[in-house]
Curated annotation (Swiss-Prot):
Binding site for Mg(2+): 14, 16, 200
Similarity comment text for this entry: Belongs to the HAD-like hydrolase superfamily. MasA/MtnC family.
E.C. designation(s): 3.1.3.77
Pathway terms, separated by semicolons: Amino-acid biosynthesis; L-methionine biosynthesis via salvage pathway; L-methionine from S-methyl-5-thio-alpha-D-ribose 1-phosphate: step 3/6; Amino-acid biosynthesis; L-methionine biosynthesis via salvage pathway; L-methionine from S-methyl-5-thio-alpha-D-ribose 1-phosphate: step 4/6
Residues binding substrate, per UniProt: 141-142, 175
Quaternary structure note: Monomer.
Keywords: Amino-acid biosynthesis, Cytoplasm, Hydrolase, Magnesium, Metal-binding, Methionine biosynthesis, Nucleus
Top-rank lineage group of the source organism: Eukaryota
Listed name of the protein: Enolase-phosphatase E1
Organism the protein comes from: Drosophila grimshawi (Hawaiian fruit fly)
GO molecular-function terms, A-Z: acireductone synthase activity; magnesium ion binding
Length: 245
């Protein structure tokens, strides 16, 4: 059992592999965005929001590489852009305009009842207890803030957003850089040593620890196994029931 110091004021959680299964993100969300990109672009092609996303997609260096490998110059229409979107998703390229578009597609899917956010069965109870005990819960994920909120608002355990006080994505910095965690602590107006960061990625835990935060690794089913060295370096738990704050 991981014993956090009693002075913990904020629990900062990762999503993928921590609150939510990696398979949900890779086997449900990503394919859903890939399969529905064309229809969404066709439906919203004339909106300012979509026009901006398309412009930003075309400005990516990946677009130049993609276009150079085509037999003919790509056209500027929903079908052509959706093919580029599939290209990005298949290569797991985490670029901002793609994340924005994915978030919008997912928002429609959640609103239509076609998607529900996965959370492990211990998450809702832990969130409720920490919130009741006056401990703030914040989220830090590579997924956009909008996408984070959708997972928790439309989760299989109900709407968990009321438990969450702040959301951070890569706009604040890379998850494996200690400066990002320093900025998060500053944004939360809390000293880093009063923040417990929960993640499944040792490199992220190392960055958070370098910033002065407490850290615990999650060993969820489907997560990459920890090495013996990582087990010695960090505390780890199987689920949130093993965390005491």
């Amino acid at each position: 059992m991981a014993q956090a110091e009693s002075s913990t004021e904020v629990v900062l959680v990762d999503i993928e592999g921590t609150t939510t299964s990696i398979s949900f993100v890779h086997d449900v969300l990503f394919p859903y965005a890939k399969e529905n990109a064309k229809d969404y672009l066709l439906e919203t092609w004339q909106t300012d929001e979509t026009k901006l996303i398309v412009k930003e997609l075309q400005q990516l260096p990946h677009y130049t590489e993609y276009a150079a490998n085509l037999a003919t110059q790509p056209t500027l229409d929903a079908e052509a852009i959706s093919r580029f979107v599939r290209y990005l998703i298949e290569r797991d390229l985490k670029v901002t305009p793609l994340k924005t578009l994915q978030g919008l597609i997912w928002a429609k899917g959640y609103a239509d009842g076609q998607l529900r956010g996965h959370v492990y069965e211990d998450v809702a109870g832990a969130f409720g207890k920490w919130h009741q005990d006056g401990i703030r819960i914040a989220v830090y994920s590579s997924g956009s803030v909008a996408a984070q909120k959708l997972i928790f608002q439309h989760s299989i355990a109900g709407d968990l957003l009321p438990h969450l006080s702040a959301h951070f994505d890569t706009h604040i910095g890379h998850k494996q850089q200690s400066e990002s965690y320093t900025k998060i602590a500053e944004s939360l107006q809390v000293q880093p040593q009063h923040v417990l960061f929960l993640t499944d990625v040792p490199q992220e835990a190392a960055a958070a620890r370098a910033a002065g935060m407490l850290t615990t690794l999650l060993e969820r089913p489907g997560n990459a196994p920890l090495s013996e060295e990582e087990r010695k370096k960090f505390s780890s738990v199987a689920d949130f029931t093993g965390i005491v704050v």
